[in-house]
Amino acid sequence: MSHKRLGFFTRLLDKTSPQARYRLATEQIQRAERAGFDTAWIAQHHFHEHEGGLPAPLVFLASVAAQTNRIRLGTAIITLPMENPLRVAEDAAVLDLLAAGRLEIGLGSGGTPTSFLPFGLTSDQRREAFTNHLNTLLRAWRGETLGHPDNRLYP
C-alpha cells in the first residue's frame, strides 16, 4: 500500500483580534506538525472576517514556514481573479524556496460575489479572469518570456 498523507484545512475564525487569529492558526499548524500531519491548508478571504479574513495567505505561510520544519503548507485557495498573476507566481516561487520546497498551491475562481467589486471585477467575470490569470501564472512558472524576451520569472 502506498503511503497515505494526512492533512488538515483551517480558517481564521476565532472570535479575537486579527493578530491573535494569526498566532492561533500558527500554533495550530505547529501542533499539527508535531502530531505527524503532512500538510496544512489555509483559505484566502478578502474583507469578511466571518469567512476567515485572510487576505494574504502567502505572507502568512512565510511566517509559518519560518516556524516549522517538515509540514507542507498549502493555499486552499488563492482567489486568482483578484490577484496579479505575476505577483502570485513570484511570491509563491520565493516562498517555496524559503520553505525548502514545502509549498502547495491551490487556486480557485472565488465565491463571495461582493468581494470582486473592489478589484474592478464582477462575479460574472471571475471565470474568464481566472483562465487568463492562470495562463499567465503557468507561463511564468514554466520560465517562458513575459512581455519581452528578457523578462522571465526569477525568484
Predicted features and spans:
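A generic, residue-level signal for flexible/boundary positions that often mark functional hotspots
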Residues: 67, 72-76, 110-115
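Short coil/turn segments at secondary-structure junctions
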Residues: 12-16, 79, 117, 121
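N-terminal beta1-alpha1-beta2 module of alpha/beta enzyme domains
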Residues: 1-67, 71-73
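Active-site beta-loop-alpha junctions enriched in small/polar residues
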Residues: 11-13, 45, 78-80, 108-112
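Short, surface-exposed alpha-helical recognition segments that flank or form part
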Residues: 16, 20, 83, 125
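Internal, glycine-rich beta/alpha segment that forms the wall or movable "lid"
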Residues: 2-4, 84-155
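Glycine-rich "substrate-gating" loop/helix at the edge of Rossmann-like oxidoreductase active sites
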Residues: 48-52, 78-84, 122-123
